[in-house]
């Protein structure tokens, strides 16, 4: 399970690729709930998906991905340092990938706060503290699987800055 955040109005250098070929999925014969990309359009759809992923990578505010292991520590940190930016509902809904929206103003303020903390060394200190805490957990403790990294914070800051607000999926 992962979290895919989509920019609501990302600042982009090029237009986002759009699929106009209708529903690409078709039911697999002999199954009740299994679907696949229609074999007749698979190559075309794969090309579209590749171009869309390239566009997302080239435009920082378009899409941000984290698996659940990386997302939770990041969101914990963000909610702690942005407690006067995010509402209680934002904080709670950020732990679920069900489409909660963070508006452009909040996204910009989150980015600004993260930049400040990146610059003043607060995030480096937090990463060191977090790593020490994780290393002291007992073997087999699932919390050892939740890493925190400055690079992840940096990428999230850039996403927030350029997203125009975002949805958490």
Language-model features: locations:
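Acidic (Asp/Glu-rich) sequence patches and key acidic residues
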Residues: 1-169
């Amino acid at each position: 399970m992962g979290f895919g955040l989509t920019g609501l109005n990302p600042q982009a250098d090029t237009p986002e690729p759009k699929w106009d070929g209708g529903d690409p999925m078709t039911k697999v014969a002999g199954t009740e709930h299994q679907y696949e990309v229609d074999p007749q359009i698979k190559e075309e759809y794969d090309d579209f998906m590749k171009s869309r992923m390239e566009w997302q990578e080239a435009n920082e505010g378009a899409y941000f991905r984290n698996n659940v292991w990386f997302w939770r520590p990041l969101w914990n940190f963000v909610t702690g340092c942005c407690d006067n930016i995010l509402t209680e509902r934002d904080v709670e809904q950020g732990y679920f990938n069900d489409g909660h929206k963070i508006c452009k103003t909040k996204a910009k303020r989150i980015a600004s706060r993260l930049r400040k903390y990146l610059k003043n060394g607060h995030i480096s200190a937090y990463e060191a503290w977090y790593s020490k805490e994780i290393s002291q957990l007992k073997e087999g403790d699932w919390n050892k699987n939740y890493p925190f990294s400055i690079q992840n914070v940096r990428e999230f800051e850039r996403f927030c800055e350029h997203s125009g607000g975002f949805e958490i999926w």
